[in-house]
Amino acid sequence: MTHFTEPKVIYQEANPYGTFTAYLEDDGRTVYLYLQGEQNPEFGIKSVWVCNRVEAPDKRSAEDLSNGLAPLLLHSEVNEPKPQPAFEEKELYFIWTEEGDGVALFYKEVLVAFLPSWSGIKGFHGYSFHAKIEALTAYPLGNSDFGIIPDRVRASRNFWEARSKQGAWKEIQEKRLSFLESKFGKHDKYWSADGGKYPQLGIARFQSEKFPEILIYSTIGMSAQNMPTVELFHKDYEDYARIELILAVKIGLEGLERSESWVPHLIGELIRFPWNMAKWFGHGHTITMSRKDPEALYLNFTSVLFRDFESFSLLNVPDLSGFISENGKQVRFLTLLPVSEEEKEYAQKGGIQSFNRMWDEKGFSWYHNSERQTLI
């Protein structure tokens, strides 16, 4: 009969965003690294085998599986079949990925495991220094100092060190405000939008002489860190991972302040979404509107469509290209276009290119008009 002890969490830590928690668990047989989402129940729990704490067996035990025990790696799957000693908590620490949905485990300053954002896809778990071959719950990490994984972890360490420097947020904030003010003129309102949590974020409002009929609201700071999971969809993910959102609204009959009742709140609910949910925003994406437009006249706007400013064929669209983030990559500015349920379904079925072409042909603009007619 297999003897086992109650699993013990020997190290635990939340990511800097406060949205994911990683913990290291030792059940006397194995040590596993786990990652769970705090705000997205769909994320579930991801895991990677770190090491065996008992002699590596030649085959897996059906009894272990029936008892719900974490799988051991076999003699043929590990670098060292002998039991690994217990970890000393004081020698453990995590380095989180910039995106916050992946974590590296260090022990005595050595990288021993990495649980990346693509963990959980097609049966993949993560990487372990003690894995010899591609096994059930771990792939080999290889060299802990050189290679793609160590380089990536090193880049994450450098990112967090840079962000922890005094004055880092002020530089980030001023750089973005300066760029937007070169396009729209001085901002006339600013809200802190991070709720006192990391990352620091804000919303700025502009009344531009170039666009006197509209109010322009922009996020400040989203582009200072990569969004999660972009690399699952784009090989050159760093070209898509940094964005700022803009929601511009045509000034209605009720004046400037009417938009204040919903626009900053809507943006405020979107601004942390990527890091809260481990999801990303990109050109052609849609998301349900959490706030209603009180000035909507003909349409019930239920979703917002994200559209890259560079995709418009219209005249009089601001040129927001050329802004480079701290990582040397260009920032993509996405405008938020409220759409009806019918318009959203049309875009999803017919394709975003067809939808955008029709939008431009009908002369709809890059900003939101509460009184517009339906596109379809």
Descriptions of predicted regions:
Residues 1-376:
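Short linear motifs embedded in intrinsically disordered, proline/glycine-rich low-complexity segments
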